[in-house]
Design a protein with these regions (language model features):
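Second-shell loop/turn segments in exported
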Residues: 27-28, 46-57, 168-177, 297-304, ...
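Short Lys/Arg-enriched alpha/beta "domain-start" segment
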Residues: 19-78, 82
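Cysteine protease catalytic core and zymogen-processing segment of caspase-like enzymes
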Residues: 226-322
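Structured catalytic cores of large enzymes
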Residues: 79-164, 303
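Structural recognition of the beta-strand scaffold that forms the well-ordered cores
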Residues: 165-169, 216-220, 292-297, 323-327
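Sec-dependent signal peptide cleavage junction
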Residues: 5-16
Length: 424
């Protein structure tokens, strides 16, 4: 039985039972058990039907009441509880020094906020309630259509595999998902283009430590801006981007991940694990991400307007990534997915990541509000989301230089339909 994991952190108690930041060196089984007790109370609240029906103000009141009770029991530090209404998170610190939080906006509501349909002034692109991996479709530009035809007839003697990609899908558990069918479609299409694509729908912290196996890694998950308090004698606050996973915290995992939890490389929101930039910096400190392209769809991956935070990109580049792409601000779902689709399609055609991204922006707009208004949207969100490239804009997949449109002969439309059907 594991009883402790050594790690740098904070530990001490004052006369009132509050824990202050000094030098906790281990996460014990007792610490993990206390966190699980607190997590059980938090998830009982956030997973309840009553919480789902509450207004945001009512959720805040309920969250603060729950944390007050947990502080009374000595499970969380009372002086660490902090409300960030702008980002919709109540943050806190467990008694052992690990960071936690309660989301005031549920994951499915995050989908609604960024879906650009209904109250946002646009209709869904199709009846998503009826959408399945076989009926979801993504639009094809003419050059991608011709590339798919060329590969079908092997007129360019392309290699069987032009690279390996992984979609780290953590938006939801895929059940009745409005998003997942489109990603399943993209996976199948890219496979047909020679990009061997793995779809990971149960993304874990361990998975995010093995991204170096792929040429292209796509982080398809919710993101947030997390603010927390720290310091013993003088309190400070820090805000940083995080990536939310669907991996639930357990006692065993808390012990295994003890180093990262105590070092604040991993935090817990609503009892689920989330990662900070330092998680990637530590996981790939030896530069294992050599030549990998990282494409993040997460909201606020690079912070927000007037507070751009490049820590995620810097950590991945320091870990050896050749190129990192991510968004500033919250991004509309359909715009983000369309940008991903067009960019990867053109990567698979042999373009550099810089050219592929430029094509996507020319097609869908420099930012999501431009796209939104062109679609007839009437009530755009406050700040436009835009995709930024860091690192080498000339990174590319293993596609021959001579893979050009001029070398492709025209193919029958009905044969292309067969390609797309097999991909779907």
């Amino acid at each position: 039985m594991l009883t402790a994991v050594l790690a740098p952190a904070a530990w001490a108690a004052d006369g009132a039972g509050e824990v202050q930041d000094t030098a906790k060196s281990a996460l014990t089984t007792g610490d993990a058990a206390e966190m699980q007790q607190a997590d059980a109370a938090v998830t009982a609240l956030t997973g309840s039907d009553e919480y789902e029906q509450m207004s945001r103000e009512e959720r805040l009141t309920a969250a603060l009441a729950e944390l007050d009770e947990l502080a009374r029991k000595g499970l969380v530090r009372r002086d660490s509880i902090r409300t960030d209404e702008e980002n919709g998170i109540v943050s806190f610190t467990y008694r052992c020094g690990v960071l936690g939080g309660i989301l005031l906006t549920l994951p499915d509501e995050l989908d609604e906020m960024t879906f650009d349909a209904g109250d946002n002034g646009l209709r869904a692109p199709r009846d998503i309630a009826q959408c399945t991996p076989r009926t979801a479709e993504m639009p094809l530009t003419d050059d991608v259509r011709q590339a798919a035809e060329a590969r079908q007839y092997r007129e360019n003697a392309l290699p069987e595999t032009i690279g390996r990609a992984a979609i780290y899908y953590a938006f939801d558990n895929t059940v009745n998902s409005s998003r997942f069918p489109y990603y399943s479609y993209m996976q199948g299409f890219w496979e047909g283009m020679g990009l061997r694509t793995t779809m990971n729908t149960r993304v874990t912290l361990s998975d995010l430590r093995r991204m170096n196996k792929y040429d292209l890694c796509i982080l398809s998950a919710h993101g947030a801006y997390y603010t927390y308090s720290y310091g013993t004698f003088r309190k400070h606050t820090r805000t940083e981007p995080i990536i939310l996973l669907t991996e639930a915290s357990t006692l065993y995992k808390d012990i295994i991940y003890g180093f990262d939890l105590l070092a604040h490389r991993i935090i817990k929101l609503n009892g689920l694990y989330c990662v900070t930039a330092d998680f990637f910096r530590n996981a790939y400190r030896s530069g294992q991400l050599s030549n990998t392209i990282i494409y993040s769809e997460t909201c606020e991956f690079l912070g927000v307007t007037n507070s751009v935070d490049e820590s995620m990109a810097e950590a991945l580049l320091a870990g050896g990534a050749r190129t990192v792409l991510g968004y500033v601000n919250n991004v509309y779902t359909v715009y983000s997915r369309s940008m991903l689709w067009d960019t990867v399609n053109h990567l698979a055609m042999g373009q550099t990541i810089g050219r592929a991204l430029a094509h996507a922006k020319d097609t869908y707009g420099e930012n999501d509000i431009i796209w939104y208004t062109e679609q007839g949207g009437r009530r755009p969100h406050a700040a436009a989301a835009y995709l930024v490239l860091y690192g080498d804009e000339n990174a590319r997949l293993n596609v021959p230089e001579n893979f050009s449109l001029e070398e492709r002969a025209e193919a029958a439309e009905d044969m292309l339909a067969d390609v797309l059907e097999s991909a779907a």
